[in-house]
């Protein structure tokens, strides 16, 4: 399995992971052999890359639970994005507490591992997907520690919000990844601190 950036996707490549829309509806299933039109659709959907299977690689098995987890991650990511966009505009979040409750109910009671891999659509998606992943792991760790539900909800909400300041960082800095200057790093720190002021 390889991660291939959108501009490098070629017809005939096969998807290793399913692609879902914001509502968790399946757009492309695993093992889909990509056509030119599929690639246009993936590009229009805003993906920065996808996981593909190597030419001779068999489709790896995936459990129903792993499939649901992939779907939920995408659904949660878009819900979180809607909430954080509202907050960044000075509005109340639409359903951040509902999202925290969903994550806590679903993952704050698990007694087994889950497999994390993420398909990031854009540099800002990093914030949303990463925050959702941290929230899920926090709910699982909190459950293992025997924390009360009210405490789990607080921890999950904190996980959703802790990287919020990255949304204010100028796009040209975010696109640089690790190739940032000391001045740009200071700028990022200021935006992250500003988010909590």
What are these regions (language model features)?
Residues 55-189, 193-197:
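Acidic/His-rich, divalent-metal-binding segments that scaffold phosphate/diphosphate chemistry
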Residues 1-100:
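Terminal helices and disordered tails flanking the catalytic cores of nucleotide-processing hydrolases
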């Amino acid at each position: 399995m390889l991660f291939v950036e959108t501009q490098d996707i070629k017809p005939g490549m096969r998807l290793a992971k399913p692609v879902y829309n914001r509502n968790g509806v399946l757009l492309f299933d695993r093992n889909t052999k990509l056509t030119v039109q599929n690639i246009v659709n993936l590009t229009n959907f805003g993906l920065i890359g996808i996981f593909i299977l190597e030419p001779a690689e068999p489709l790896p098995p995936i459990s129903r639970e792993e499939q649901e987890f992939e779907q939920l991650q995408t659904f949660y990511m878009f819900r979180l994005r809607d909430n954080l966009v509202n907050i960044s505009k000075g509005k109340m979040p639409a359903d951040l507490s509902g999202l925290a409750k969903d994550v806590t109910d679903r993952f704050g009671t698990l007694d087994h591992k889950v497999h994390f891999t993420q398909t990031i659509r854009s540099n800002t998606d990093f914030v949303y997907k990463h925050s959702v992943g941290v929230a899920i792991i926090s709910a699982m760790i909190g459950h293992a520690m025997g924390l009360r539900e009210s405490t789990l909800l607080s921890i999950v909400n904190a996980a959703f919000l802790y990287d919020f300041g990255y949304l204010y960082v100028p796009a040209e800095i975010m696109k640089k990844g690790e190739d940032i200057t000391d001045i740009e790093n200071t700028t990022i720190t200021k935006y992250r601190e500003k988010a909590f002021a």
